[in-house]
């Protein structure tokens, strides 16, 4: 799984931004995101501030989907059940690799980062020619 998670992360990072879909009171919500990382535990992590409405939506309805499109007109959809982590080691590893997040979510800011990984993850890689590969 670690190799596939790295492949997914590489594609998402190459796109620059991806879109995260969640559900809020029965309605779809989509927003741009930029953070993803594969940590030493082999899991692919996403995250946002714990104060964001998106965080509450995902806690209430953890089935989410991520979609990213490349300049080559290829796209990746990743879905699963979000599982939040409050493990200090996870947070430390995320902040060690991301100066922006480390500063934004420093103890002085009063803000808290809420990382999550996807359980029962599925991923489809698609091309404009109609081909589709199951990555997970």
Where are these regions (language model features)?
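Hydrophobic residues embedded in beta-strands of well-ordered beta-sheets
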Residues: 28, 42-44, 123, 132
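Charged, gly/pro-rich active-site loop segments
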Residues: 77-136
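Charged, amphipathic alpha-helical segments
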Residues: 1-6, 48-54, 99-101
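General beta-strand recognition
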Residues: 19, 43-45, 77, 124
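A short, Trp-centered hydrophobic/proline-enriched beta-strand micro-motif
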Residues: 10-26, 64-68
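A short mixed-secondary-structure module that forms the rim of ligand-binding clefts
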Residues: 36-71
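Hydrophobic/aromatic beta-strand elements that line small-molecule binding cavities or substrate pockets
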Residues: 33-37, 80-82
């Amino acid at each position: 799984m670690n190799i596939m998670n790295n492949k997914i992360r590489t594609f998402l990072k190459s796109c620059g931004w991806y879109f995260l879909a969640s559900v809020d009171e029965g309605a779809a919500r989509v927003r741009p995101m930029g953070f993803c990382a594969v940590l030493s535990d082999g899991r692919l992590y996403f995250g946002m501030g714990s104060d964001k409405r998106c965080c509450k939506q995902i806690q209430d309805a953890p089935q989410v989907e991520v979609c990213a499109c490349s300049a080559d007109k290829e796209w990746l959809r990743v879905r699963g059940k979000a599982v939040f982590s409050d493990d200090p080691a996870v947070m430390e590893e995320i902040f060690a690799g991301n100066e922006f997040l480390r500063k934004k979510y420093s103890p002085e800011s009063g803000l808290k980062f809420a990382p999550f990984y996807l359980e029962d993850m599925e991923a489809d890689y698609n091309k404009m020619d109609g081909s589709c590969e199951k990555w997970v």
